[in-house]
A protein has these predicted regions:
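DNA breakage-rejoining catalytic core of tyrosine-based enzymes
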Residues: 34, 75-76, 88-107, 166-167, ...
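C-terminal secondary-structure termini that scaffold catalytic or DNA-interacting sites
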Residues: 152-156, 201-205, 218-222, 306-332
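Basic/aromatic-enriched alpha-helical hairpins
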Residues: 1-50, 65-67
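Active-site/catalytic core of tyrosine-dependent DNA strand-transfer enzymes
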Residues: 184-257
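Basic, Lys/Arg- and aromatic-enriched nucleic-acid-binding interface segment
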Residues: 52, 56-58, 71, 75-76, ...
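Short, polar N-cap/turn motifs at the start of nucleic acid-interacting alpha helices
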Residues: 142-151, 157, 259, 278-298
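Conserved tyrosine-mediated DNA breakage-rejoining catalytic core shared by Y-recombinases
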Residues: 129, 138-194, 198
Length: 332
């Protein structure tokens, strides 16, 4: 669970919680259902006050477990999570400036690709498809052969994706909303994937990737794991370096430097770009949202004021119709 974390982070998350003159030393997973009190939940909520949405996610998950146990008559008590309020939802509506977005796209297709092909393909994938990180990392070159292989991946390139002058698509079999999704493979991304595939055959440094079914196989330091796909931890250093190169490292309210560009912000940037060019309805469908309200709540989209417009004056067409009617009467 704490792979890649610093000792300081590990110590922080495993330390006992001193809350309201009581010390809570057990993690939530170690409680049995009947002994978890609302005070213990409040203590863990207090511990996660700097990452409120993390607490909300945990609380939602465990609340579902309690409800399931009650429905199946495994547990007869109350759901303790009903008695502890969650943190208010923070809807972050942000995107990259258009010029920065375009520069990143150009950078992915530049000479820099030859030196960091897999990472820049990941960056291009989020900017051209809006996929979430875990949807990108688990992609395969081809459809899995068995159900076991399918469960280990997020999706795959549909057959014929690399055929010249033909449309290509990416298939996600189990995205966040649990509905299968087929996304269009836009030409710049298609060309990068073809370029990446060729590189695997021509560059000895990455030829080991040919043994993997995944587009983005896992590597850790000097070790390679072709049977596994990459993850968010592997993107930490290259993301920071990319942000530094583009001057996108900014200081937050606590004086710490953070990345302005992340995979999540890349998804939001894609959604905003589609909304601006094709409308919110198309953007919502391209992002595989359940409805347009989700897109409006979490993405920078055209303002409602943009809907206040007049139709163009097309009297000429009306006059033509009237003239046609008069001529028709004369003929009759």
């Amino acid at each position: 669970l704490y792979e890649g974390c610093t000792d300081q982070t590990r110590k922080k998350h495993t330390a006992p919680i001193d809350y309201m003159n009581t010390v809570y030393s057990k993690p939530l997973k170690s409680y049995i259902a009947s002994e978890l009190t609302d005070d213990a939940i409040k203590a863990h909520k207090f511990k996660l006050k700097e990452t409120p949405q993390v607490y909300n996610t945990i609380a939602t998950l465990l609340s579902v477990v309690y409800n399931w146990a009650k429905m199946n008559k495994i547990y007869k008590g109350d759901n303790p999570f009903y008695f502890v309020k969650r943190y208010p939802k923070v809807r972050v509506k942000v995107k990259l400036p258009d010029d920065v977005r375009d520069k990143l796209k150009d950078y992915c297709e530049s000479k820099a690709f030859d030196y960091n092909a897999h990472f820049l393909t990941i960056v291009a994938t989020v900017l051209y498809t809006g996929f979430r990180g875990n949807e990108i990392y688990g992609l395969r070159w081809k459809e899995p052969r068995t159900e076991e292989e399918k469960k280990k991946c997020s999706g795959w390139l549909l057959s014929g994706w690399d055929t010249p002058n033909e449309k290509g698509h990416i298939f996600l079999w189990d995205p966040k909303n649990r509905k299968e999704f087929k996304a269009y493979l836009r030409t710049p991304l298609k060309n990068l994937l073809i370029r990446l595939r060729k590189k695997l055959y021509n560059d000895p440094k990455v030829s080991w990737c040919l043994d993997s079914d995944y587009i983005f196989p896992k590597s850790r330091w000097s070790a390679n794991y072709p049977e596994e796909h990459t993850d968010s931890y592997a993107q930490t250093f290259p993301l920071r370096k990319l942000n530094e190169e583009f001057g996108l490292r900014t200081e937050n309210s606590k004086g710490r430097l953070k990345n302005l560009f992340t995979i999540k912000i890349g998804r939001k940037t894609f959604g905003s770009e589609v909304a601006a060019e094709r409308g919110i309805e198309i953007a919502s469908r391209a992002l595989n949202h359940s409805d347009t309200q989700v897109t409006r709540d979490h993405y920078v989209v055209p303002e409602d004021s943009d809907l206040d417009f007049e139709f163009e004056n097309k009297k000429t067409n009306v006059e033509n119709i009237e003239t046609h009617r008069e001529k028709k009467k004369e003929i009759i």
